[in-house]
Amino acid sequence: MSTFYVPAINLIGRGVVNEIGSYVKDLGYNKALLVTDKFIQSSEILPKVTKPLDEAGIDYVVFSDVEPNPTCKNVTDGVSALKENNCDFIISLGGGSPQDAASCISVIATNGGKPQDYEGLHKSAKKGLPVVAINTTAGTSAEITINYVITDEERKVKMVMVDKNSLALISVNDPELMVSKPAPLTAATGMDALTHAVEALVTPGAYGVTKKLSIGAIELIKEYLPRAVKDGHDIEAREGMVNAIFLGGMSFNNAGLGYVHSMAHQLGAVYKLPHGVCCAMLLPVIERENAKRVPAAFRDVAKALGLDPAGKTDEECAAYAIKEIETLSETVGIPKKLTELGIEEKDFDFEYLSKNALIDACAPGNPFMPTLEETIAFYKELF
């Protein structure tokens, strides 16, 4: 038997953010903690969300102290703000960082404790406080998944939480909220979405439904990501990417991820690098190794990226898929080496990051479990 998790209500398409007030009112909630970041708080996006809330008579208080790669302190401060203002539900507004912070705030609000208590698989006992998750980037799919990531500042580790009790009640994916996103952010989040779809397709946890979802996501990303990066106001491309992340999010939410994410989490935790960029740089490195172990799994990846696999060997399909991934990454402007991001090999703590990657919650989803030495070698390929 396979369990399939997805929010109960999912609003997708142009202008759907205008409907949130009526949905919240019908559900009987009164006051929201609106979790976001400083950029969105000062942008044109926030009024597009607060306007329908005001019209529906829904009260809210804005909590914008969420950093990129949200920390334990961000979460505990959010929990304090929620309690001080007597909020009975949460609205998360943003990309992966506000979404992840809101998920952890939700779980702690009903279960108590601290973020570290929930690292790992399904550690909470009670359903979290209701969350209306409004996404503003086409990448993480955090608005529809049971996964969230919080950085432990003291240990310099990204803690991966997989918890069905953190699942949002309502997800909102409105492409009109994404047109102002700059090209580098669009590229990074889009490559994160591609990583989700590819990892979910080749993981041993993949099954019929999730495989179809991953394939659809990969096809859409190849078609629409370059367009969205080239012209952020290409609303058709933005809508295509919204559809891609919804499909890919449903896939990895239920099939799992792999070692690309395990290694990328460490780069973000220690060096505060953009998660999507880290995933994009690592994706061909890890999938090249995965293809040696499970080459047949890459026939679907290659087909989704444009190859007719008829008459081709598994190895030929895998080589094509990895080359296409590298080409797409280059097309949208992703750096190839960590030195381009200001990280020098002589300063890189290979053993520390590699040891943490091996115990990351995403690692068991990979087609094979690398050794410490192999992981160090993978990181060395980024220099």
Predicted regions and their residues:
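N-terminal small/polar loop signature for handling phosphorylated ligands or for N-terminal nucleophile
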Residues: 41-116, 227-238
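An N-terminal, well-structured beta->alpha segment
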Residues: 1-63
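Short glycine/serine/threonine-rich phosphate/pyrophosphate-binding segments
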Residues: 17-20, 42-45, 72-73, 97-103, ...
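C-terminal charged capping/lid subdomain of soluble metabolic enzymes
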Residues: 308-383
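Conserved beta-strand elements of the Class I
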Residues: 33-34, 89-91, 132
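Active-site segments that bind and position negatively charged phosphate/pyrophosphate groups
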Residues: 200-327
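A glycine/threonine-rich phosphate-anchoring loop and its flanking beta-alpha core
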Residues: 18, 110-206, 297-300, 304
